[in-house]
Amino acid sequence: MSQSYELTAEARERVGKGSARAIRRNGKIPAVIYGDKQPPLSITLPYKEVFLRIHAGGFRTTVATIDLNGEKIQVLPKDYQLDPVRGFAMHVDFLRVGKNTVVTVNVPVHFINDEKAPGIKRGGVLNIVRHEVEFTCPANAIPDFIEVDLTGLDIGDSVHISAVKLPEGIVPTITDRDFTIATVAAPAGLKSEGAEGGEAEAGQAEEGEE
């Protein structure tokens, strides 16, 4: 799990587009904290700190602490809006995290031991079907990533979620099938040779029929 961090917030009394624009002009960003059966809180946060956190990676999988007038609130960033043209952050939604909060998150997939995969050593290409996998898990136990071991994979082999060792309490949201994470595909040259070989065999068969 990524290292938690703290942001200092101020309560926001006014809401709406006009108020939000004024907040952003003052170097801050509007945000809201919701969930855990409590009323939503409208707040403002320092723009620079939030922007850096968003672009540092792992923003939506790291539990943070928001200090609101001395009250420490555990939260998980759930969504944020970026300006479509200039790319700056415009708004953030935070989920309030309680002791027993279970969340749904997208967790990145990391691949290891590609040098131990015969198919890749022979020139095969790792075709990544899912760069992230959606899981439900305790908010205080979100993994930074899951590891997929490629050891022993040959050309044509696939890795399914059932083959991935998951931390305790981490459950895929897709439960009705053993979905594919990645496959090892044949290199282009090998595919061409296979196609040519098939055509030659077909030609020989036709000659034999005559």
Swiss-Prot record:
Keywords: Ribonucleoprotein, Ribosomal protein, RNA-binding, rRNA-binding. One of its GO terms (molecular function) is 5S rRNA binding. Residues 190-210 are annotated as: Disordered. The keyword Ribonucleoprotein applies. It holds the Pfam family Ribosomal_TL5_C. Residues 196-210 have a biased composition (Acidic residues). GO terms for cellular component: cytosolic large ribosomal subunit. InterPro entries: Rbsml_bL25/Gln-tRNA_synth_N, Ribosomal_bL25/Gln-tRNA_synth, Ribosomal_bL25_b-dom, Ribosomal_bL25_C, Ribosomal_bL25_long, Ribosomal_L25_dom, Ribosomal_uL5_bac-type. GO terms for biological process: translation. Transmembrane segments: none annotated. HAMAP family: Ribosomal_bL25_CTC. NCBIfam families: bL25_bact_ctc, PRK05618.1-2, PRK05943.1. Part of the 50S ribosomal subunit; part of the 5S rRNA/L5/L18/L25 subcomplex. Contacts the 5S rRNA. Binds to the 5S rRNA independently of L5 and L18. Belongs to the bacterial ribosomal protein bL25 family. CTC subfamily. This is Large ribosomal subunit protein bL25. It comes from Chelativorans sp. (strain BNC1). The gene is rplY.
